[in-house]
Amino acid sequence: MKNNNKFWILFGLTILLSLSSQLFGQVNRVLNISPTAHETSVGNQSLFFRSPAHNFFTKDDSLSQVTFTRMNWLGNITEGMTFNYVEGNWKDFDISLTYMDYGQQKHTDDMGVILRNFSPNSFIVYLGWGTQLNYKDIPMKNTFIGFSGKFIKHDLFTEKGSGLLLDAALHQKNILDLFDLDVMLNNWGYAPKIGSVSTEIPTNIGIGTTIEKNNLTFYNQWNFYKGYYTHGQGVKYRYNNFLNLKMGYFNDVEYKLNYPTLGIDLKYANYVLHVGYIGGSDNLPLRNTLLTSINVEF
């Protein structure tokens, strides 16, 4: 009997450690979350809104801005998970801070007595820079490049880890007088190590196109990971420079995340309110997620 009990105890520990390793290994997926409502509502168009090369192209030297986002995450399956994001644009630089709180957890002893509460979390610091590309000291009117770095730290209570990731981006404007092109290598570098577990980095090559026709803007973006890809598409209707109506669709076959998105932007003076909504089927963990971002220009 003792040998039999010992077998099941060892078996259970093996399964538990395996699950922990898988969870730790996937913790960097926080990097794939679209942090603002205006990005999410057109099918997660991260290149158009956050590529350092594209941000430099759209930069107004007289304008700086700050964006704030806070939302409940995976509210259909858990409580207490929050996503918090703040971004600032100044001259040629973009700076952002991301804080993901995975919700309050309980640490118990072997008898089930609660010893303390804790909140595992992830923290990301981002710095991006862009510039116009020169050829033989002559500026190339339609070509821009950008680079960015991310410091990421995970605090999972019993284990901690940090890493450094880099991005490189290209923005090519007005190809064939039809569309703009964004290309970006995302998330390559030193992966955080959680205890003895090596984490997986969501390294990918992103390709995005943008077409503007009168008051309509059409977006497409493909993200190519090792062995699979995701695709987002969206459209924005602009009305009198104070109202945007948006819709999109995101498709991730590998992780079975397929959902429509909706959004609206309202601008008053130097303030812009972005509201986004994620729809989807009843079994989608992200279903009915509401995102609100506030943009302040100065």
Give, region by region, the residue ranges found by the protein language model.
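Subset of outer-membrane beta-barrel
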Residues: 24-298
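Bacterial N-terminal signal peptides that target proteins for export
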Residues: 2-11
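Bacterial N-terminal signal peptides
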Residues: 10-20
